[in-house]
A protein has these predicted regions:
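Nucleotide phosphate-binding site architecture
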Residues: 12, 45, 82
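A short, surface-exposed loop/turn module that caps and links secondary-structure elements
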Residues: 28-53
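Flexible interhelical turns and helix-capping residues at alpha-helix boundaries
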Residues: 15, 19, 34-37
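Enriched for short, Lys/Arg-rich terminal
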Residues: 2-5, 16-24, 54, 62-85
Length: 85
């Protein structure tokens, strides 16, 4: 099954501000998520969110299996990303 990936505008703007190499690594990982959203992912403790590691960056997302949706919650450097979660 292929999931639909939802990336909010604020996340797209963050991606645009990141470097080309970082942006391409993140996008390729997001495309991979569409087919297998839990592969190489870890659940964030005490939340419904998942995370994947891409070098020093993290992608936080939620999965809605009944609708086949993946909603990207946040993308950022590992030292800053967990302050909200």
């Amino acid at each position: 099954m292929i999931y639909t990936l939802i990336i909010p505008n604020k996340i797209n703007k963050k991606l645009d501000r990141s470097g080309i190499k970082t942006k391409s690594r993140i996008i390729s990982k997001l495309i991979f998520l569409k087919t297998n959203p839990r592969h190489h992912a870890e659940r964030i403790k005490d939340t419904e969110f998942w995370k994947i590691r891409i070098g020093k960056f993290r992608v936080i997302y939620s999965i809605e299996d009944n609708k086949l949706l993946i909603l990207i919650i946040n993308i950022g450097h590992r030292k800053n990303i967990y302050k909200k979660y």
